[in-house]
Amino acid sequence: MLPLFQGPDSRLRGNDEAILLAEGQKSAVTEYYLNHGEWPKDNTSAGVASASKIIGKYVKEVEVKNGVVTATMNSSGVNKEIKGKKLSLWARRENGSVKWFCGQPVQRDDVAAANDDDVKDAAADKIETKHLPSTCRDTSSAE
């Protein structure tokens, strides 16, 4: 049962967990990209646990799809503002390595295309920017 008062601290606690769990997949995604020249298609190709096994108190799952790491919040036990909502971590090539971003959910359609760094907004299930930590407010156009 949730406490009656739900301040911003409790919202951020769920987001912090989502970011920590998603960040735990970054090194595997980066390593895959640097070794193969393309983003991993899914959790298996990235060499991480299945989405349903990367969970937490507030996080339902963490999915790797075309190199984008997306955490989905639980639909219960969290504030209504983030119930079932998502945030993403994604990277772009930069000087022989990769630069990571964090923000509202994005998707990458084609991992083998020349523009395989491009991501676009994933329209559904966004956590409103005001409920995201200041360190996780990048947009799909971030560089």
Put a short name on every predicted segment:
Residues L34-E143:
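Periplasmic/extracellular, small/polar-rich flexible segments of pilin-like filament-forming proteins
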Residues M1-L4, D9-S52:
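Conserved hydrophobic/amphipathic alpha-helical signal-anchor segments
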